[in-house]
Amino acid sequence: MKITGFQPLIVSPEAEKLISLFEELGFEQRHEKTGINDKEISNVSMKDANGFRVDVTKGATVPTDLTAIRMNVDDFSEAYELLVKHGFKNAQGYRLTQTSSSTDTLMVSPSGFGIVLSQHIKD
């Protein structure tokens, strides 16, 4: 398994304010994925001139900000099993989020640390 991306992901009830803050810090919106899990949830990927990245998720019903690491991999199943072996649990039970461009899920460690595991679908 190869890690192909590794950046912070912030889920926030005030996502628009965070996006504005990161824009003032020099980040630009690269793309936005909408309708995640058939809900009004969207994720904005941002990048600055130095190549640093951050993702901001909006529309999720969380009372406060939740910060995790987004880890993109080339083999979702292998990474998923590795995290399970280390005590991580899928926050969606057995469900995975499937979109036209990726497979994702939030994996949570026994201490509460979150990794959003993701594999991009390549045509």
Regions found by a protein language model. Name each.
Residues 4-14, 32-34, 44, 59-123:
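Vicinal oxygen chelate
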Residues 36, 61, 75, 97-98:
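Short beta->alpha connector loops
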